[in-house]
C-alpha cells in the first residue's frame, strides 16, 4: 500500500519528469508546493499551461518562441551571413548570455543518433540545407556539444556546407568533452566561442 494519495503520487511522478529531479527531490518539491506555497503552485500550474499551449518553434531557426518568428530572426540588426548551429534552445540562451554573437542560429533539437532513431530528417537538416542553398549564409559556426553524437552531427553539417562552398568553423574545445553547453560557466563558454576554428570534418 502506497503512503501517497493518488493525486500526490501523480504530482511526484510528474515532477520526476524534469531533468535532474529524482524521487526524493520530487517529493520535497511536491510537499513544499502543497504545504507551504499553494499560491505559488497555482501560479506555476498556470504558467506551465500557458507555455505548453502558447510556445512553439520558430519556423526559421527552431528556437522556442510564442511569436510567428522569434525575436532573433525578426531582428534587422542580426548578421544573416553568420549561422550558428546548436542542439537546443538552451544552447542559444547560453551563447546569448556569454558572447556578443550577432548572427543567427539554427536549433537542431538534438544530435544525430542512429541507435535512438534520430537521423537528419528528425533534426530538420533539410531546412538547414534550404537555407544554405538560398546563398545568404557565408559561415556556419558549429556549436554542437562535444559528445560522440555532437561530433557526428557537426561532421554531417560540415559536409552540407562544403557542398555549397560555405565556410565552416567549430567553437573551440574549452567546453569539456561529454559536457552540455547549458552547464558551462560563461567565461569558459565565451572563451570557447571566441576561439572557434575552421572545421574540416
UniProtKB/Swiss-Prot annotation:
Q: Any idea what this protein is called?
A: Recombination protein RecR
> Organism's domain of life?
Bacteria
Ordered alphabetically, the record's keywords are: DNA damage, DNA recombination, DNA repair, Metal-binding, Zinc, Zinc-finger
Job of this protein:
May play a role in DNA repair. It seems to be involved in an RecBC-independent recombinational process of DNA repair. It may act with RecF and RecO.
Question: What's an example GO BP annotation here?
Answer: DNA recombination
ZnF C4-type residues are 58-73
Q: Which GO terms describe its molecular function?
A: DNA binding; zinc ion binding
NCBIfam families according to UniProt: recR
The record's section on InterPro entries has: DNA_Rcmb_RecR (IPR000093), Rcmb_RecR (IPR023627), Rcmb_RecR_Znf (IPR015967), TOPRIM_dom (IPR006171), TOPRIM_RecR (IPR034137)
Which family would the database say this protein is a member of?
Belongs to the RecR family.
Domain Toprim positions: 81-176
Q: Tell me the PANTHER family matching this sequence.
A: RECOMBINATION PROTEIN RECR
Q: Which Pfam families match?
A: RecR_C (PF21175), RecR_HhH (PF21176), RecR_ZnF (PF02132), Toprim_4 (PF13662)
Amino acid at each position: 500500500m502506497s503512503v501517497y494519495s493518488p493525486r500526490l503520487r501523480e504530482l511526484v511522478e510528474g515532477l520526476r519528469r524534469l531533468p535532474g529531479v529524482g524521487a526524493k527531490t520530487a517529493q520535497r518539491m511536491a510537499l513544499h508546493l502543497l504545504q507551504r506555497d499553494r499560491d505559488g503552485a497555482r501560479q506555476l500550474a498556470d504558467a506551465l499551461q500557458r507555455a505548453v499551449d502558447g510556445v512553439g518553434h520558430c519556423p526559421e531557426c527552431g528556437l522556442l518562441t510564442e511569436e510567428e518568428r522569434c525575436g532573433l530572426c525578426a531582428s534587422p540588426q542580426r548578421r544573416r551571413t553568420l549561422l550558428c548551429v546548436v542542439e537546443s534552445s538552451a544552447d542559444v540562451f547560453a551563447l546569448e548570455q556569454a558572447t556578443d554573437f550577432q548572427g543567427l542560429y539554427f536549433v537542431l533539437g538534438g544530435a544525430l543518433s542512429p541507435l535512438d532513431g534520430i537521423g537528419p530528417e528528425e533534426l530538420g537538416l533539410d531546412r538547414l540545407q534550404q537555407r544554405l542553398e538560398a546563398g545568404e549564409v557565408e559561415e556556419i559556426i558549429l556549436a554542437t556539444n562535444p559528445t560522440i553524437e555532437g561530433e557526428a552531427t557537426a561532421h554531417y553539417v560540415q559536409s552540407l556546407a562544403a557542398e555549397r562552398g560555405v565556410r565552416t568553423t567549430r567553437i573551440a574545445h574549452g567546453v569539456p568533452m561529454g559536457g552540455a553547453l547549458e552547464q558551462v560557466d560563461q567565461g569558459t563558454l565565451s572563451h570557447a566561442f571566441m576561439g572557434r576554428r575552421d572545421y574540416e570534418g
